[in-house]
Protein backbone atom coordinates (compact mmCIF):
# COMPACT_ATOMS: atom_id res chain seq x y z
CA UNK A 1 0.00 0.00 0.00
CA UNK A 2 1.45 3.43 -0.92
CA UNK A 3 2.71 5.69 1.86
CA UNK A 4 1.86 9.36 1.29
CA UNK A 5 3.58 12.38 2.84
CA UNK A 6 1.51 15.55 3.14
CA UNK A 7 3.25 18.91 3.55
CA UNK A 8 1.05 21.57 5.13
CA UNK A 9 1.06 25.00 6.73
CA UNK A 10 -1.42 26.46 9.20
CA UNK A 11 -2.36 29.34 11.43
CA UNK A 12 -2.59 27.86 14.91
CA UNK A 13 -4.72 30.56 16.52
CA UNK A 14 -7.97 28.61 16.64
CA UNK A 15 -6.51 25.18 17.40
CA UNK A 16 -5.55 23.23 20.52
CA UNK A 17 -2.37 22.08 18.84
CA UNK A 18 -1.35 19.71 16.07
CA UNK A 19 -2.11 16.30 17.56
CA UNK A 20 -5.62 14.89 17.81
CA UNK A 21 -7.22 15.16 21.28
CA UNK A 22 -10.61 14.36 22.73
CA UNK A 23 -13.04 17.30 22.82
CA UNK A 24 -10.53 19.65 21.16
CA UNK A 25 -10.16 21.25 17.75
CA UNK A 26 -6.77 20.26 16.30
CA UNK A 27 -4.94 20.35 12.98
CA UNK A 28 -4.83 16.55 12.73
CA UNK A 29 -8.56 16.25 13.41
CA UNK A 30 -9.42 18.79 10.70
CA UNK A 31 -7.27 17.07 8.06
CA UNK A 32 -8.62 13.62 8.95
CA UNK A 33 -12.18 14.98 8.80
CA UNK A 34 -11.58 16.51 5.35
CA UNK A 35 -10.08 13.22 4.15
CA UNK A 36 -13.19 11.34 5.28
CA UNK A 37 -15.42 13.78 3.38
CA UNK A 38 -13.37 13.45 0.18
CA UNK A 39 -12.40 9.77 0.18
CA UNK A 40 -15.28 8.28 2.16
CA UNK A 41 -12.92 6.41 4.48
CA UNK A 42 -11.15 7.34 7.69
CA UNK A 43 -7.39 7.29 8.24
CA UNK A 44 -5.02 8.03 11.12
CA UNK A 45 -2.31 10.55 10.31
CA UNK A 46 1.21 10.47 11.80
CA UNK A 47 2.76 13.93 12.25
CA UNK A 48 6.36 15.16 12.09
CA UNK A 49 6.22 17.80 14.80
CA UNK A 50 3.48 18.16 17.40
CA UNK A 51 3.05 21.91 17.76
CA UNK A 52 1.29 23.23 20.88
CA UNK A 53 -1.97 25.15 21.08
CA UNK A 54 -1.84 28.47 19.22
CA UNK A 55 1.49 27.77 17.50
CA UNK A 56 1.70 28.38 13.74
CA UNK A 57 3.54 26.34 11.10
CA UNK A 58 5.02 27.37 7.78
CA UNK A 59 5.95 23.73 7.22
CA UNK A 60 4.91 20.48 8.85
CA UNK A 61 4.24 16.95 7.61
CA UNK A 62 1.82 14.05 8.01
CA UNK A 63 2.13 10.56 6.58
CA UNK A 64 -0.56 7.96 5.98
CA UNK A 65 -1.15 4.75 4.02
CA UNK A 66 -3.90 4.52 1.41
CA UNK A 67 -4.57 2.72 -1.87
CA UNK A 68 -5.80 5.30 -4.38
CA UNK A 69 -6.41 9.01 -3.81
CA UNK A 70 -8.80 11.29 -5.66
CA UNK A 71 -7.08 12.54 -8.88
CA UNK A 72 -7.47 16.14 -7.66
CA UNK A 73 -6.63 15.30 -4.06
CA UNK A 74 -4.79 18.49 -3.03
CA UNK A 75 -7.24 20.80 -4.76
CA UNK A 76 -10.29 19.06 -3.29
CA UNK A 77 -8.80 18.78 0.21
CA UNK A 78 -7.94 22.48 0.28
CA UNK A 79 -11.49 23.30 -0.78
CA UNK A 80 -12.85 21.29 2.18
CA UNK A 81 -10.34 22.40 4.82
CA UNK A 82 -10.77 25.64 6.81
CA UNK A 83 -9.00 28.70 5.43
CA UNK A 84 -6.35 28.58 8.15
CA UNK A 85 -4.99 25.17 7.02
CA UNK A 86 -3.32 24.69 3.62
CA UNK A 87 -2.00 21.48 2.09
CA UNK A 88 1.05 22.34 -0.04
CA UNK A 89 2.46 19.11 -1.49
CA UNK A 90 1.93 15.37 -1.51
CA UNK A 91 4.65 12.76 -2.15
CA UNK A 92 4.64 8.97 -2.40
CA UNK A 93 7.48 7.39 -0.39
CA UNK A 94 8.62 3.85 0.46
CA UNK A 95 6.49 1.94 2.96
CA UNK A 96 9.14 2.26 5.70
CA UNK A 97 9.37 6.09 5.46
CA UNK A 98 8.27 7.86 8.64
CA UNK A 99 7.46 11.57 8.94
CA UNK A 100 8.45 11.74 12.60
CA UNK A 101 11.36 9.33 13.00
CA UNK A 102 13.07 10.16 9.69
CA UNK A 103 13.09 13.92 10.32
CA UNK A 104 16.63 15.07 11.16
CA UNK A 105 15.67 18.36 12.80
CA UNK A 106 12.94 20.92 13.38
CA UNK A 107 13.42 24.69 13.29
CA UNK A 108 11.29 27.20 15.19
CA UNK A 109 11.17 30.99 15.23
CA UNK A 110 9.75 33.14 18.01
CA UNK A 111 8.85 36.57 16.63
CA UNK A 112 8.73 39.78 18.67
CA UNK A 113 7.91 43.35 17.68
CA UNK A 114 8.96 46.40 19.66
CA UNK A 115 6.83 49.11 18.08
CA UNK A 116 3.05 48.75 18.33
CA UNK A 117 1.56 47.39 15.11
CA UNK A 118 -2.04 46.11 14.94
CA UNK A 119 -1.25 43.97 11.88
CA UNK A 120 1.28 41.85 13.80
CA UNK A 121 -0.67 41.19 16.98
CA UNK A 122 -1.75 37.64 16.01
CA UNK A 123 1.66 36.54 14.75
CA UNK A 124 4.25 38.10 17.05
CA UNK A 125 4.61 39.19 20.68
CA UNK A 126 4.44 42.91 21.39
CA UNK A 127 7.32 43.54 23.80
CA UNK A 128 8.13 47.26 24.20
CA UNK A 129 10.56 46.87 27.12
CA UNK A 130 14.20 47.94 26.99
CA UNK A 131 16.42 44.94 26.23
CA UNK A 132 20.15 44.26 26.34
CA UNK A 133 20.46 42.32 23.09
CA UNK A 134 24.10 41.39 23.73
CA UNK A 135 23.15 39.59 26.95
CA UNK A 136 20.35 37.77 25.12
CA UNK A 137 22.81 36.66 22.44
CA UNK A 138 25.08 35.31 25.18
CA UNK A 139 22.14 33.37 26.60
CA UNK A 140 21.33 31.97 23.14
CA UNK A 141 24.94 30.81 22.79
CA UNK A 142 24.68 29.01 26.15
CA UNK A 143 21.55 27.19 24.93
CA UNK A 144 23.53 25.95 21.91
CA UNK A 145 25.97 24.18 24.25
CA UNK A 146 23.31 22.35 26.27
CA UNK A 147 21.55 19.03 25.71
CA UNK A 148 19.44 18.49 28.87
CA UNK A 149 16.26 20.59 28.96
CA UNK A 150 14.15 19.22 31.82
CA UNK A 151 13.69 22.72 33.39
CA UNK A 152 12.36 24.01 30.05
CA UNK A 153 9.37 21.75 29.48
CA UNK A 154 5.81 22.01 30.75
CA UNK A 155 4.99 20.38 34.07
CA UNK A 156 2.27 18.13 32.61
CA UNK A 157 4.56 16.56 30.00
CA UNK A 158 4.58 12.80 29.46
CA UNK A 159 8.18 12.90 28.21
CA UNK A 160 10.70 10.50 29.73
CA UNK A 161 13.68 11.74 27.71
CA UNK A 162 14.72 15.38 28.22
CA UNK A 163 17.78 15.38 25.96
CA UNK A 164 17.79 17.45 22.76
CA UNK A 165 20.66 17.99 20.32
CA UNK A 166 21.02 21.67 19.40
CA UNK A 167 21.98 22.74 15.86
CA UNK A 168 21.17 26.46 16.01
CA UNK A 169 20.34 29.01 18.70
CA UNK A 170 20.53 32.68 17.76
CA UNK A 171 18.80 36.05 17.84
CA UNK A 172 18.18 38.04 14.66
CA UNK A 173 17.49 41.71 15.30
CA UNK A 174 16.02 44.47 13.16
CA UNK A 175 15.09 48.06 13.93
CA UNK A 176 11.62 47.38 15.36
CA UNK A 177 11.64 43.61 15.73
CA UNK A 178 13.64 40.61 16.83
CA UNK A 179 13.40 36.90 16.28
CA UNK A 180 14.80 33.92 18.13
CA UNK A 181 15.73 30.99 15.86
CA UNK A 182 16.32 27.54 17.30
CA UNK A 183 16.90 24.22 15.56
CA UNK A 184 17.26 20.81 17.21
CA UNK A 185 16.65 17.15 16.55
CA UNK A 186 13.60 17.28 18.84
CA UNK A 187 11.79 19.60 21.25
CA UNK A 188 9.95 19.20 24.54
CA UNK A 189 6.46 20.54 25.15
CA UNK A 190 6.58 24.32 25.65
CA UNK A 191 10.38 24.33 25.42
CA UNK A 192 10.91 27.12 22.88
CA UNK A 193 8.59 29.53 24.69
CA UNK A 194 10.18 28.82 28.07
CA UNK A 195 13.68 29.37 26.66
CA UNK A 196 12.65 32.57 24.86
CA UNK A 197 10.88 33.94 27.94
CA UNK A 198 13.95 33.26 30.08
CA UNK A 199 16.23 35.07 27.63
CA UNK A 200 13.89 38.06 27.66
CA UNK A 201 14.30 38.14 31.44
CA UNK A 202 18.06 38.21 30.87
CA UNK A 203 17.63 41.01 28.34
CA UNK A 204 15.63 43.05 30.87
CA UNK A 205 18.29 42.29 33.51
CA UNK A 206 15.73 40.62 35.74
CA UNK A 207 18.08 37.65 35.96
CA UNK A 208 21.83 37.48 35.26
CA UNK A 209 23.60 35.29 32.72
CA UNK A 210 24.90 33.21 35.63
CA UNK A 211 21.38 32.71 36.99
CA UNK A 212 20.17 31.77 33.51
CA UNK A 213 22.94 29.19 33.18
CA UNK A 214 22.09 27.70 36.57
CA UNK A 215 18.48 27.03 35.50
CA UNK A 216 19.79 24.17 33.33
CA UNK A 217 21.24 22.44 36.38
CA UNK A 218 18.12 22.88 38.52
CA UNK A 219 15.76 20.03 39.25
CA UNK A 220 12.75 22.30 39.00
CA UNK A 221 10.83 23.86 36.14
CA UNK A 222 11.64 27.30 34.76
CA UNK A 223 9.13 29.89 35.97
CA UNK A 224 8.98 32.07 32.84
CA UNK A 225 6.78 31.72 29.76
CA UNK A 226 5.29 33.79 26.95
CA UNK A 227 2.21 33.40 24.69
CA UNK A 228 2.14 30.91 21.83
CA UNK A 229 1.02 33.27 19.05
CA UNK A 230 4.57 34.48 18.31
CA UNK A 231 5.90 30.97 17.69
CA UNK A 232 6.29 29.40 14.23
CA UNK A 233 7.51 25.99 13.16
CA UNK A 234 9.36 27.00 9.99
CA UNK A 235 11.19 23.87 8.77
CA UNK A 236 11.15 20.12 9.23
CA UNK A 237 14.39 18.81 7.73
CA UNK A 238 14.83 15.37 6.17
CA UNK A 239 17.91 13.70 4.63
CA UNK A 240 19.08 14.95 1.23
CA UNK A 241 17.04 13.58 -1.68
CA UNK A 242 14.53 12.08 0.78
CA UNK A 243 11.58 13.12 -1.39
CA UNK A 244 13.23 12.02 -4.64
Model-found features: residue ranges?
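Structured-RNA-binding interfaces characteristic of tRNA pseudouridine synthases
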Residues: 1-244
Amino acid sequence: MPRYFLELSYKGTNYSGFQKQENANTIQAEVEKAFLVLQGQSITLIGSSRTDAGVHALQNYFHFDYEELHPQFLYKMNAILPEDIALKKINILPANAHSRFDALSRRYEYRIYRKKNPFLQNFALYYPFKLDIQLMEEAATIIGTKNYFFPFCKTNTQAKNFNCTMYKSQWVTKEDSLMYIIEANRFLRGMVRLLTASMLQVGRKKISIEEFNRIFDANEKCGFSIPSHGLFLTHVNFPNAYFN
